């Protein structure tokens, strides 16, 4: 496709029309110039291709497809190779269904566990979100189709999402809410970026030039197209000028008229319109180069992939007394409606019309079952509960399948509590009171409270595990698969412990991010708060030993890297996988920083007795924070701790790294600056120190005698 030639031949009306979709899922064709329409579809956990009337909330039916584990589950695998393989599967499905663009993954940070859409997002940590997102996008796009990362940016709640203003300081934005997008843009080059519904610091994301042009294109070098979230356009011409290319859905003609009127009025230039059209033509050209005829949507094979991802993502939160894995021949009873009808996916635009869903009961023949509770209500049903308790008494082990019904969490609204339904909590407590070998298997999209956690010996977190949820659960429970997932989010003990408790979801359509950079484990670990389960936590049916931490150099300067290696050994009796996590703890400096941050991870598979060496590479960005004075990332000189372990609170080995910055952080002294502030800065001390020495000598004093003066500002002297 000769893009510049086509651009020259297009009329202003065709250009304006081209910048809006032709309907709910297709771009606008320019038939006389040979530009075809291409189709896009949700979503991040499986195809939601709609042949009937389109919608963005999963109301109307879509083609039968495979539902894969949600992003919350996939992130818990801490396995980028697995994420890339999943992406390849999704990309192949897109080709087979003649889809040009898959709308996902979502890269928004889990600011609060209450966000109703958290199941669609990877993590509370931007580094993990970026690495997993880049792997998934690379896999999707390896098939010649596009991936559209979303929702750019700071779309961290469903409450008032169309109008809410996410208000935060520059450092918080660049350090927490943008890095995942930056990583994916630079490492995977997604063909699409979706502008979010919400405002960011007073300006709608779909018309935010700082976000869409200054940061995305100029700073990060993005060359793809920007599409609005469905119905996110407020002012079409402002959006084009800001760097937003495609309005979705289309078909009304309002966008075309708005653009043409703005050009006529001089508020939108032809160059700005041409830039948007050029981006869209490049996108269409890119996704129409690959022949789709050879691609086959093998639903059976893809179901096996869904099972594998679920098995590798499940997190064993607790396992006392060796209750798990279940012994062969033990008399087990499965309790809870989720054992028969699992909660395997989230609601809203990610909803997949599953061709096949497995339940735990069908994969555990001969196991007794009692319903225990109903998912369509929260109140205790005495008859159902009593029958379940009686069945538990008669068994060697009781396995309770519990979690959150779909009505508790979905796109479109946020949760108001971390509690599970009353009837489920009551059932778990009642069963645990009579059966010491009680296992809880959880189906939920985000963190929950567990008032019964001290009363049960084992808890297995599946999240929303897709079509293979039931089969994966049984394989994990009986030890056919060894759990290897790690939590990609902290599980707090109670809602009031969460860092955004006082400001989420905000008020009067404004959400102030008052917690700043202290999100998730950055807050909990810095404040040493008691949590239910920490970030990165996850057990195994075997044990692992960490040893021999080495740094390739002890001092690093600007432009240099350091390699960190550690040896991990499987010290148990069965094969297993361990995710080695690397955290960086900064020295005390000019800015308040989290006590430690994840800067590397690697998942290794080990046979009993086997050892492997794991290597990480750290650079300046690994040590840096975002400095508003510089409008860039900055790493202060000093000694950094390099910590390696099994979670953010299970750190096995620590090394020291000396970083030497190319230049000290600029500082501004004013008449209101204290002597302490001046004297603790090397430049200030060099200037003021000799003056104070002369003053002290003239008065017959030493500097110690005037140390009290450091409490006062310079204006006092």
Where are each of the predicted segments found?
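Low-complexity, Pro/Ser/Thr- and charge-rich linker/hinge segments at domain boundaries
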Residues: 660-679
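Residue-level detector of conserved catalytic or cofactor/ligand-binding positions
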Residues: 704-717
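Terminal connector regions
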Residues: 620-663
